[in-house]
């Protein structure tokens, strides 16, 4: 556990396990032998409140009965409603769209709302995502990290605009190009890729796969007037694309199956070429 410069707490527990880790989505998987409806599940939940001086990190165990279609999100809500109203965790959409419920599930970052309890039980250990500032228990401030990263990368279209004309039609775009941009825009900023990243766990200024993916998205956009030289000034160092160690934990855990491996390799190749000019 470490302290941030502004007094926040970042908790680093349970490193990502690339090999032999349980599945973290609701894709069809075979449940472990013996996990069936009516069986008791044991949830070992990391508890810690950085705002309470008396609080210390510890695992707290809860038991719930397995029910059909129970996700970890459903289980956590049941724990909070019936067993412990003080338990903190995040959620919004419950459909794998907002990314709020991301956490470390049996050592692997994933979304609670897209993980079936039967796929990771009967013994389930939950912890907050590392790297991000801890709010309490399973709740972390991914928004603060993502905002700082986006502002640093200037993650918006840079357009040499004349006077604003609300009557002018939007510029046309080739449908195939629009689809390529949309593919990268599917990122939900859940933070799973950052938490699975070895570099991000070692240096706080690394932009992670989510940042490199943003650069790849705007580089595709014909409305953005920036050049590779401009992008090199932003990500052409060890805190940017050259900090990636190619462990590809990010690619393994992305709940939206984004082509992170391809985009990281592509952007790094372009930045190497730019740096050699």
Language-model-derived ranges and their functions:
Residues 46, 57, 104-107:
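Short strand-turn-strand beta-turns centered on an Asx-Gly dipeptide
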